[in-house]
């Protein structure tokens, strides 16, 4: 995500978009960090694990995600899933995005 040529406000907006993507994908099924990173890269976001994991930890500490550690092939993977509070937040955000989309593009 970090591009030192981007103004700070643009990086903050992108960080918000990334959080929305995280909520969207974890509402569909649990994801672990590497999967989320790869998914976000498909959307054009370049971010390090040093950026992603603090975002996930913050969403978890705020009660929007829950984490479950699962042993997979001898590795402990941290799977993240959206909570009820996360779904409520996601719905509020998407309502605002729809409103913004109408204003800008219609």
Task: Give residue spans per PLM region.
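Short, Lys/Arg-enriched N-terminal segment that forms or immediately precedes the first helix
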Residues: 1-11
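N-terminal helix-turn-helix DNA-binding core of bacterial DNA-binding proteins
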Residues: 10-51
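A cross-family signal for key residues in well-ordered alpha-helices
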Residues: 21-24, 57, 91
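Basic amphipathic alpha-helical segments that dock to polyanions
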Residues: 52-54, 58-59
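Beta-hairpin "wing" of winged helix-turn-helix
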Residues: 62-75, 81
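Basic, amphipathic "hinge/linker" alpha-helix immediately C-terminal to the N-terminal HTH DNA-binding motif
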Residues: 76-93
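Amphipathic alpha-helical dimerization/coiled-coil segments
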Residues: 88-106
